[in-house]
A protein has these predicted regions:
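Twin-arginine (Tat) signal peptide motif
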Residues: 1-8
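C-terminal helix-rich "cap/oligomerization" subdomain common to oxidoreductases
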Residues: 8-39, 111-113, 332-373
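N-terminal Rossmann-like dinucleotide-binding module
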Residues: 11-88
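Rossmann-fold dehydrogenase core element
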Residues: 150-167, 187-190
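NAD(P)-dinucleotide binding in Rossmann-like oxidoreductases
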Residues: 250-259, 264-328
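Hydrophobic residues in well-ordered beta-strands that form the structural core
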Residues: 137, 143, 162-164, 274, ...
C-alpha cells in the first residue's frame, strides 16, 4: 500500500521488526484479513490444553480468516468429546498426552498451540517440533532461560517456527503508541510505569504451585509489564533491581511470588518501575513519560477494550478480539513469512525469561543485576 511507505524508517531498536502503520493502514490490513474473498493458505491449528484460556482462543478462532482450529490434545477424554462437538473436530485430529507424537503423520495439522501449565511448555514444544509441526507457546514461553533455550534450539533443529502468544503485540492502540514513539513524537523517553495485578482465587490452582507455574504472579501477570516496558520504551534493559513482599505465606509458598516491585534500567537513560501482584485488584496500566509528551494505556492488557490516550488526545482505534487478530497474524508469519511489527518469536520469549531470571536473582541477592540481551 502506498500510504504504508510514509512510515518506512530505518529503526535501531531490536524490538521493532517492521515499519509501523498509520491508523488507516492498520484498519485496511484488518479489513483485508476479514475479507470473504480471501482464498489463500489457512493455518490449521491443534490446541493442547483445553482449559479456560484454551477455550477463549478456540472461540476467538471462529472469526479468523487465515487460521482454523482443526485438532485437540488433552489428557481429559471428556473435554475432547465436548470440544469435538462444539468445534467440529474430527476424531482423527484428537490426541492425548501419550500419543500426540503421532501427529507427525497427520498432514491436516500445521501447528500446535500449547496452552498448558508453564512448566509443561518445554517438553511439549520439543515433542511437537520433533513431529515437524510449528509451535505456538502461550506466555511465558517456559519457566526459565535454560528451558527456553532448549525450546528455541529444538525448533531450529526441526526447521519449524516457534512463536509465543503475545497477543498485545497485535493490539491497535498498543501499536499506535509504539508508532508515535518510534516516529519521535514523544521525544526522549524518560520513564515507564507498569502495574499488573489481580487478586487470585482458588489456592489449589496450578498457578500457585511452583512445580507447574515456575513462580507466581511474575510468571503469569508481571511478564506483561516486562514486555510492555520493552516495546513501549523501544530498548532492551541493561540492569534490574527487585524487591518481594509476602502477606500470605500459606497461600504463596516458597518459590511462589505474591508481590514483586522491580525496576529496569535502559541504555538511553529511561527507567521502568513495575509492580506484579496476586493480591491487589484493578492493576492493569502502562504509562510512558517523555520529554515532549506521554502515553497511557489503562486497561493495558485485559481482554476487554484497551483504553488509551496520549498528550495528543484519546486513542480511538476500534476494539478487536485479541486472540482472533493474533492467530490470523501468526498464520501470516508461519505460512507467508511475514514479520510482525513487534516480534513474537522464540528469541523474543527468551528475552523476557532472561529478565524474569534476573528479577528473581536480584531479589535473592538484594543487588542490582546486569542484563545483556
Amino acid at each position: 500500500m502506498n500510504t504504508r511507505r510514509n512510515f518506512l524508517q530505518k529503526l535501531t531498536g531490536s524490538l521493532i521488526a517492521l515499519p509501523l502503520l498509520s491508523k488507516k493502514d492498520y484498519l485496511e490490513s484488518l479489513n483485508e484479513i476479514k475479507s470473504k474473498k480471501y482464498d489463500g493458505p489457512i493455518l490449521r491449528v491443534a490446541i493442547m490444553g483445553l482449559g479456560s484460556y484454551g477455550t477463549r482462543v478456540a472461540d476467538a478462532m471462529k472469526d479468523c480468516t487465515k487460521a482454523k482450529l482443526v485438532g485437540v490434545i488433552s489428557g481429559t477424554p471428556s473435554k475432547i468429546t465436548t470440544w469435538q462437538s462444539k468445534y467440529n473436530i474430527p476424531e482423527k485430529n484428537c490426541y492425548n498426552y501419550e500419543n500426540y507424537d503421532s501427529i507427525k503423520n497427520n498432514p491436516d495439522i500445521d501447528a500446535v498451540y500449547i496452552i498448558t501449565p508453564n512448566a509443561l511448555h518445554k517438553d511439549a514444544a520439543i515433542r511437537v517440533a520433533k513431529a515437524g509441526k510449528h509451535v505456538i507457546s502461550e506466555k511465558p514461553m517456559s519457566i526459565n532461560t535454560k528451558d527456553g533455550e532448549q525450546m528455541v534450539a529444538a525448533c531450529k533443529k526441526a526447521n519449524v517456527k516457534l512463536l509465543v502468544g503475545y497477543r498485545m503485540h497485535f493490539e491497535p492502540k498498543t501499536l499506535e503508541v509504539i508508532r508515535m514513539r518510534t516516529n519521535g513524537e514523544f521525544g526522549k523517553v524518560l520513564f515507564f510505569q507498569g502495574l499488573s495485578g489481580f487478586q487470585i482465587g482458588d489456592p489449589t490452582q496450578w498457578r500457585l504451585k511452583k512445580e507447574l507455574s515456575g513462580g507466581g504472579a511474575m510468571m503469569d501477570i508481571g511478564i506483561y509489564s516486562i514486555n510492555g516496558a520493552r516495546y513501549m520504551i523501544g530498548e532492551e534493559p541493561i540492569w534490574v533491581t527487585a524487591q518481594e513482599t509476602k502477606t500470605n505465606k500459606e497461600k504463596f509458598k516458597d518459590g511462589v511470588d505474591e508481590t514483586i516491585l522491580f525496576q529496569l534500567g535502559f541504555p538511553g537513560g529511561a527507567v521502568a518501575s513495575c509492580l506484579s501482584t496476586y493480591t491487589m485488584n484493578n492493576l492493569d496500566s502502562f504509562f510512558l513519560n517523555a520529554e515532549k509528551g506521554f502515553a497511557e494505556l489503562k486497561p493495558s492488557t485485559g481482554y476487554g477494550p484497551i483504553k488509551g490516550k496520549t498528550n495528543k488526545g484519546e486513542l480511538d482505534y476500534p476494539h478487536v478480539t485479541h486472540q482472533t487478530v493474533q492467530m490470523d497474524k501468526m498464520a501470516e508469519i508461519i505460512l507467508e513469512g511475514k514479520q510482525p511489527i513487534v516480534p513474537v518469536d522464540g528469541d523474543e520469549g527468551l528475552k523476557d525469561l532472561k529478565i524474569i531470571d534476573a528479577i528473581y536473582a536480584a531479589i535473592k541477592s538484594g543487588k542490582k543485576v546486569s542484563l545483556s540481551l
